[in-house]
Amino acid sequence: MAAESLPFTLETVSSWELEAWYEDLQEVLSSDENGGPYSSSLGNEEGESKTFTTLDPASLAWLTEEPGPAEVTSSSQSPRSPDSSQSCMAQEEEEDQGRTRKRKQSGQCPARGTGKQRMKEKEQENERKVAQLAEENERLKQEIERLTREVEATRPGSDRPHVNLQQV
């Protein structure tokens, strides 16, 4: 049996993007549990609400690839008139902007929180490294001082004239 290819690429995805997809998935799943299409206020001035139904494969491809406008009309749109495809693209852009606005208004910005946590962890790790290096530096200074004292103690003995026993 041949393996099917994945509908998306396995590239690195930023944490904020994953969080956004996760939130969208939670919204869709909660609408399925409630027995119908999901209706949500997107936070725009008119209080307009959009109805979301299940995602089709073209929408998933659009979410994962984020293609330019030409690719959207060629890959995910059925043959329509130019006006209808432009209005559909505008609607998708409005939905995307609405989701972004909703996340910003709700105060959920996971990338910043995660980023701050990572920065804090890295800062703590760097502080530990600095402390270890300072201890090592102090130990090496003490070793240098000890060796310097040892050299100074042996130097007077080495200044005596050497006697060549073969000449006698």
From Swiss-Prot:
Region annotated Interaction with TRIB3, chain positions: 10-18
Any one Gene Ontology cellular component term annotated for this protein: cytoplasm
Localization terms from the record: Cytoplasm; Nucleus
Chief place where the protein resides: cytoplasm
Residues of the signal peptide: none
Coiled coil: none
Subunit structure of this chain's protein: Heterodimer. Interacts with TCF7L2/TCF4, EP300/P300, HDAC1, HDAC5 and HDAC6. Interacts with TRIB3 which blocks its association with EP300/P300. Interacts with FOXO3, CEBPB and ATF4.
Protein name: DNA damage-inducible transcript 3 protein
Species per Swiss-Prot/TrEMBL record: Cricetulus griseus (Chinese hamster)
Gene name of this polypeptide: DDIT3
